[in-house]
């Protein structure tokens, strides 16, 4: 995997959502005194850990990036994806919530709420149907066994070798 492709995907998507826009909000609205540095830092660190783990899995297992123009070519159902279907979004939302708590900013809390609502709508209505088209029955089986948002306590061991995309965008039979 080309390191530049990976870095570009990280900087453009989660970097924009979790760093550039919150920094702009703080710049224009002012910084309140940090009310809860420990709690805010905890959420930020959990979010960063999830983002790093999921990006690494997309590269090493999925042979792609989080960017829509270079998505994983294999369905990723290892690591944190054995517990929950959307750990990358969970990581980004943890970072946004942590920033709101850390800075004591209602504007950043509103930005977190916007991101949460957007993903609660987008994931089931757009992303999941697209993944069903790309990976077929394997993704349907994954959806039935791994929750969208609340992690399972035990890892799901259902797919030993997940689907890989054909050139025309359908899973291998």
Write out the residue ranges for each language-model feature.
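Membrane-anchoring alpha-helices and their flanking helix-loop junctions
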Residues: 1-81, 90-173
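Extended, alpha-helix-rich binding/interface surfaces that flank or overlap catalytic cores
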Residues: 86
